[in-house]
Amino acid sequence: LRLKPRARRVIVLGLDGLDPKIAKELMDREELPNFKALSEEGCFKPLRTTIPSLSPVAWSTFSTGSNPGKHAIFDFIVPDRKTYLPVLSSSHIGNTSRSIKIGKYNIPLGKPEIRLLRKSTPFWKILGKNFIFSQVLRVPITFPAEKFYGTCLAAMCAPDLKGTQGSFTYFTSAPDEEARHIGGVEVKLSPKGDHAWEGKIPGPENPLVEGAPEMEIPFTLQNGSGSWKLVLPDQEVPLREGKYSDWIELTFKAGMGIKAGGIGRFRLLRTDPHVELYLTPVNIDPRKPVMPVSEPKYFSSYLSKMQGPYATLGLAEDTWGLNERVLEEGAFLEQTWDIHEEREKMFMRALDTTRRGCVVCVFDVTDRIQHMFMCYRDPSHPANRDKDTEVYKDTITDL
């Protein structure tokens, strides 16, 4: 006997890292009128967070209703018990144990093991067992996406194509003594004539070759009468100084017809006195994912066909690039809002296509902007030394 549902559809909208004190402050100042209306129609209550109060821990508790002792997520990373080196706490990606050698290639026998390490059962799987359909979009700690009655696009801790949590690439033509040595991946541009430079885009390791060297894509950066373009093996990408390119398809060839597809966005940072080029972390291509970023597998491809390419990296907003000062604040905000717009399109489509059931969507913009711009609310903060704090002091409020 099934009881009559109290609601035809439930919508859960998550805003990562949004402090209830800041939200209340803005509501009282009439700067969040929709939030205020919701609080008056329903309720507005602060929730006690987890111990420890970290995003992967708190979101795992949100998903499962379990404490960290049950879902086994206590941090972003944990020590490997064999080596004591840090490893990701939420998922495990392992190589195949057997291979066969054909010429210079080692052909893996089987697929690599990819496991979600979070324990306990998320509420959408419980809903699915009761024949209630759910769309789960970008909820943290959902990689690899699990099978259930619904669709899921993974989020926080989903890797980039290299298997990292987000490695940008900085290309420069500056000589070593003048180059900015940064913490990301730095690649030297070599001159090719008077108005062109050559470089290589580093990609994932090649598991087919002894020693697993990085796969690379060669390119030429050309300047013709002030018009810049990036010439890749199978396409040309127009570039403008201080502007992002569209998402560009990047295909790394391992050999024997095996390829790994990713997407990235370029930004020509400056052209004088030296050429500097930025590439976002190479995201797993949602059109042909090499890892399980969605459930069903075709769901990421479906979304891409509906709205175009989009970021699949869990921590897609490049906070590392901003910390290393490869990106300026304005460039970071532009990237962040572009990713937010992609998420909005997904959410609105989920609302249109799910008339019954549950829709869950998490937006990260609140977390990323607060992390990177909280210091501007305090002019005396040590991170603001020699900075004009007036420009970005209202960035969080303007959210």
Spans of model-derived segments:
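Glycine-rich loop at the start of a catalytic domain that most often binds anionic cofactors/ligands
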Residues: 27-29, 57-68
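Surface-exposed patches in mature extracellular/periplasmic domains of secreted proteins
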Residues: 47-50, 138-139
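Short, charged/polar micro-motifs that form catalytic or ligand-binding hotspots
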Residues: 9, 13, 25, 52, ...
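Active-site-proximal N-terminal segment of extracellular/periplasmic enzymes that hydrolyze or transfer
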Residues: 1-44, 53
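Solvent-exposed loop/turn segments at secondary-structure junctions
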Residues: 17-20, 52-54, 141-143, 367
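His/Asp/Glu-rich, glycine-adjacent segments
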Residues: 66-386
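Conserved structured core elements
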Residues: 17, 29, 56, 117, ...
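Beta-strand elements within well-structured catalytic alpha/beta cores of enzymes
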Residues: 7-23, 38, 62, 126-127, ...
